[in-house]
Amino acid sequence: MTESPGQAFHKAYTDDPAGARVSFDYTITEAFMPTKERPRVTVRNLLKVRPAADTTHFWQERRPPRSEVAGVSEAQLRQEATFVSGMASAGLHPVRAWVRIPDGLADDPEAFAEFIDYRLLVRLATAENQALTLGEHGILSHPDLTRLPYRGDFVAGVLAACNEIEQIGATAHAMIVNPYDWWYSMVGRSVLAELAANGTLISRTRMIAPGHALVGDFAVGARLLDGGRSEIRVEEPPPGTFATPGPAVVAEVWEGLALHLPTHFFYMTPVVDEGWTPR
């Protein structure tokens, strides 16, 4: 890459501040990562990527009705033997983030590019985290995701979810937690070093509620469908994006999610009425 998205957009903005538009033939959240100086695992980083141009058809396994489990030999020992295989499909959807350009910023090409690269693209990465977790097409929206209630200690709940994954012959490859639980329940305990030694990745994001965690075999169970195209442009944002109306700059990528194995993801949830409260 010879120039950053911010540098490319500055050229277009200088020529036409009201209608600037730059298209990219790659996904800018993948190709340019402003967090590289401050390493932090995004949800995208947990997933293998599959290029996609349109609707993608893929194989998927689901848990069967309880009435069918008894007919499978050694169903308790090898739970995955009971899973039912079929086909599913997923499309690409836009993921967008917005900023407004401060007056006078365009006079400084370096500062302008930095603002796009380190503010707009960071917000786009946040929007991507949201889309892949609790968005309409995210993992948490899948009807076959298993909810795993826990009582008491957060770390004990996380380890229980890891155990559930390995009891179906998979690996606790990664988890998504809220920063609150990372700092208050995980940092300062041996659990982070032990999970790292096991090869378990941890993404921390506000898109998972405090006290909750999404634990799964991300490497095997899902694929990020990457449209391989992006755009940064000047546009009127939807109502409610900012406190006042007026044009802004939007960054957009096109992505989807193929959840091959919803059986391999566990959403750990606290039993609130048993006494769990944020510190």
Regions found by a protein language model. Name each.
Residues 28-37, 112-124, 128, 208, ...:
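Short, Φ-rich (hydrophobic/aromatic) sequence segments
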Residues 6-95, 154:
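Assembly/oligomerization interface modules of large self-assembling protein complexes
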Residues 137-255, 272-279:
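Extended oligomerization regions of viral-like shell subunits
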Residues 60-61, 101, 177, 251:
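Hydrophobic side chains in beta-strands
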Residues 78-168, 266-279:
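Alpha-helical scaffold segments that mediate packing/assembly in large oligomeric complexes
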